[in-house]
Each structure stands twice: as C-alpha cells, then as structure tokens.
Amino acid sequence: MIWIAAAFFVTALILLLIHGRRHLRAGLPAGELVYLDVASEQPSVLVSRRYGLKGKPDALVRIPSGDVIPVERKKTRAPKRPYAGDLIQAAAYCVLVEEQYGRTPPFMRIQYTDRHFDEPYTIERKQWVLRTCQEIRQARQSGACDRSHAIPAKCRNCGQRANCDQAL
C-alpha cells in the first residue's frame, strides 16, 4: 500500500516539474495559465464595449496575487527596450483584462525569443492606449490613413500589398 502511495507521489511530482518547465520555457510568469493562444484552441478574444476595443493576447496568466497578466509573445530577439508598438499592444491587452476580470493588472509581459520584459501597467499607459484608439478612429473617419513607408521592407512584404493604392 505504501508503494502505491509513493508511486503516485513520484508521478505527481514528475508531472508538476514537466508542467513547470513548459511554463518557464514558454516565457510565462509563474501562476495559473488562464489562456494560451494555440492553433488547437478557440481564440479567446477579449472585448471592451466601454472603449470599443477588441484583442486576443498570446497568453493570460493568473499570478499568485490573483491578478491576470497578459503576455505578448514576439518572434524576434529582444531590443534593448521594448518597441513602442509592442508596449502599446500589451497595454491594450491590460485595458481589456481590466474590464474582463475587474482587476487592474500590475504589469504586462512582452516575451521575445531570448528574454522578456515585465513592464508596469500604469494609468499613463492606459491613457496612451485610449488616446491612440481615439486618434485611429478620427483618422478612419476623415479618410486620412496614409500608410507608413518608414521601413520599405515592411511594405514589400505586406499581406495587403496587392490591394493597397499606396504600395511602394
């Protein structure tokens, strides 16, 4: 009987270690995995009717404090500091998490291939997201949405190139 209990304990320990390694290897903070965007799962789109915002984070993790943290995973090496576009995307997920779960995430994680950044989610970042959303809405309404050609390679490789009247 003791051998069965010992075998059960060892098996549980091994499974726990495997799960923990996968969690860390995926670049996720310690905690309960609430959602992970993988092809086999239905997408978990978060919606804010209040702000007219939708988004699908790469992962959501409930950390030991009970807060839900959005994780944005990138397929590139980390810059010295997170790119502004990556920051605002992760901050937008924080706005969505805040509305969906009723708690403000203390930080957001941006995971690059070689390292991650845990960036604080502040009222200033929330205001940045909301201001940017408003600017986008105004630009769409006015029809003044010129494409950025600051990086010509992005234009050449864009999936909408064939439909774009501003392609290089």
Short names for language-model regions:
Residues 84-85, 124:
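Alpha-helix N-cap and loop-to-helix initiation/capping positions
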Residues 1-30:
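N-terminal signal-anchor transmembrane alpha helix of single-pass membrane proteins
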Residues 31-65:
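Active-site metal-binding core of divalent-cation-utilizing nuclease and nuclease-like domains
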Residues 78-82, 118-120:
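A generic structural signal for short coil/turn motifs at secondary-structure boundaries
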Residues 80-84, 129-131:
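A short, polar/proline- and glycine-enriched secondary-structure boundary/capping micro-motif
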Residues 85-107:
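Metal-dependent nuclease catalytic cores in nucleic-acid-processing enzymes
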Residues 44, 48-50, 99-168:
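Metal-dependent nuclease catalytic regions and adjoining charged, substrate-binding loops involved
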